[in-house]
Amino acid sequence: MSIFQILMFAATLFFAFQIYHHVQNLEDKTPNNDTDKHGDRAVFATQSLVEEADDAYERGEIGRAKEILEEAYRLEPINPEIVNKLAYVIAKGGDRLKGIELYERSLELDENDDLTHNAIASLYRLERAYERAQEHYLKALEIDERYPQTYFNYGNLLVDMGETEQARKMYKRALELQSDFPQAREALLSLGDKA
């Protein structure tokens, strides 16, 4: 593996971790028209399960986090936060195709979540489904054109696709939006540019 590939892999892992933490902070977007005690208990139960899964994940217990999130998903299958966290943990555990399937489910619930588009694009990239990855990066940019990480990730994909000139543009745009973005600067340097 070349140094550039190692850097790109590290950047992908860093981004996946950022998504996981972002998902932790999302507010519950599910409709809650049912205010009976049973509904309140279910929401409380899933919130507790998600917190327990977060703790397990932070302790490095990915399998345990997955089990807990699967239980939360059974209780509340239309909660994008739960679906995204489960997708992330399952993909992190090695089943990227199941992770992709769950991210697709999450996008059915909320098609305008740019971070979910980023996450699924990263998995498609790892699976070498470059066109699908590109579709999701472009959708993420359409939703939020000011998020530098998307430009960086899209640049990485373009490098994989052999489109280095376009990749340069993406890395430069990432640096325009966030001047202290060392991974984007290193990626430009690896392409022969002065960052």
Regions found by a protein language model. Give the residues of each.
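Helix-start (N-cap) detector for alpha-helical repeat units in TPR-like alpha-solenoids
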Residues: 46, 80-81, 114-115, 148-149, ...
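Alpha-helical segment of the N-proximal tetratricopeptide repeat
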Residues: 36-98
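Long, contiguous interaction/recruitment modules in multidomain scaffold/adaptor proteins
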Residues: 1-45
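TPR/Sel1-like alpha-solenoid repeat signature
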Residues: 56, 68, 83-90, 102, ...
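Canonical positions in the second alpha-helix
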Residues: 71-72, 105-106, 139-140, 173-174
